[in-house]
Amino acid sequence: MPIDNLPPLREVIDTYGLQAHKSLGQNFLFDLNLTSKIAHQAGTIEGKPVLEIGPGPGGLTRALLAKGAIVTAIERDERCIPALLEIEKHYPNQLKLICNDALKQDFSKLFGSSPEKPRIIANLPYNIGTQLLLNWLLVEPWPPFYESMTLMFQREVAKRITAKPQSSHYGRLSVLTGWRTIAKIAFDVPPQAFIPAPKVTSSVVHIIPRAQPLVCSAQKLSLITKTAFGQRRKMLRQNLKTLGGEIILEKAGIDGTRRAETLSISEFVTLANLIT
């Protein structure tokens, strides 16, 4: 069933000759039950500002608008703009389109004067999803410009985002996410929900910023985690040589023969605060 008398998404794709481009990391989400489920996962959004990245032909966009959200959608692919403009006509004053590369967008400036923080809700393009998340996790000042994030990733990336110490998926992304936010996998999305169908399962991750994360420089924590996990099978005293190695490990009371995947987030914060 189409939403609010708009054409079915398959018809939109045919009308505008839209095909997902692998180079842009595109996989169009067609299942309207799933788009509604993603929108619902973000909580009550009626009358609330929402930021969507990579709307494509507008499947998730329509679900967000149908729930009353005020959507700012950033789309790099100019081919999709005419289809999105048709949706904009149907929802006057509810949808703002920006044709831009999300990696180059100044989000703080975009929402700086807004009285209410946006919720970021998106089926992120696979090729920029992780980098966008890192940018949003390391943004300054903190608390950030957004209220929450409800994002689609490949299942393996979602596991890395939410992983705990001592697990194979635990790494830099897990530490940076857990430091500043509380993240959980909400539900999985099968490949057949997309066109074209990816080879892997996807997962929707819900992320809420912590009001007061452990005190630490984002830049230093980013550096220490990148260095520590650079060669994850090596001992910390070897991986951290360029950052003071055994000296900072001794000051932190951390055994230099441990591996990065055994450290808690608070231990990484302690190490980061010792970098000069």
From Swiss-Prot:
It is an enzyme of class 2 (transferase). It catalyses: adenosine(1518)/adenosine(1519) in 16S rRNA + 4 S-adenosyl-L-methionine = N(6)-dimethyladenosine(1518)/N(6)-dimethyladenosine(1519) in 16S rRNA + 4 S-adenosyl-L-homocysteine + 4 H(+). Pfam families: RrnaAD (PF00398). The keyword Protease does not apply. CDD domains: AdoMet_MTases. Keywords: Cytoplasm, Methyltransferase, RNA-binding, rRNA processing, S-adenosyl-L-methionine, Transferase. It is found in: Cytoplasm. It comes from the Bacteria. GO terms for molecular function: 16S rRNA (adenine(1518)-N(6)/adenine(1519)-N(6))-dimethyltransferase activity; RNA binding. One of its GO terms (cellular component) is cytosol. SUPFAM superfamilies: S-adenosyl-L-methionine-dependent methyltransferases. Its EC number is 2.1.1.182. Belongs to the class I-like SAM-binding methyltransferase superfamily. rRNA adenine N(6)-methyltransferase family. RsmA subfamily. Specifically dimethylates two adjacent adenosines (A1518 and A1519) in the loop of a conserved hairpin near the 3'-end of 16S rRNA in the 30S particle. May play a critical role in biogenesis of 30S subunits. This is Ribosomal RNA small subunit methyltransferase A. It comes from Bartonella tribocorum (strain CIP 105476 / IBS 506). The gene is rsmA.
